């Protein structure tokens, strides 16, 4: 049976992550409060950020920026700003 969490991003009960994907206290917070669906949404945004901003995951500043964006997206309800990106409309 799947583990469920009260997802802070989706604001509903949903299937939780199978295991802690991110290290440390933030990783525990994500594991306890973020659903698989919300994590998948974040991963898509993360990929776009890395590509559009040409982030280097070996660079500490780039990793810190990405972590800040992740917290803003998952816990504070802030949309990720990606220059030039226009979301596709449902009727397209």
From Swiss-Prot:
Disulfide bridge positions per record: none
UniProtKB keywords: Iron
Tagged with keyword Transcription regulation: no
GO cellular component, one term: cytosol
Pfam families linked: Iron_traffic
UniProt-listed Gene3D superfamilies: Fe(II) trafficking protein YggX (1.10.3880.10)
UniProt xrefs under InterPro entries: Fe_traffick_prot_YggX, Fe_traffick_prot_YggX_sf
Keyword check for Iron: yes
Domain of life: Bacteria
Gene Ontology terms for molecular function: iron ion binding
Single GO biological process annotation from the record: cellular response to oxidative stress
Protein role: Could be a mediator in iron transactions between iron acquisition and iron-requiring processes, such as synthesis and/or repair of Fe-S clusters in biosynthetic enzymes.
Family: Belongs to the Fe(2+)-trafficking protein family.
Name recorded for this polypeptide: Probable Fe(2+)-trafficking protein
Natural source organism: Shewanella loihica (strain ATCC BAA-1088 / PV-4)
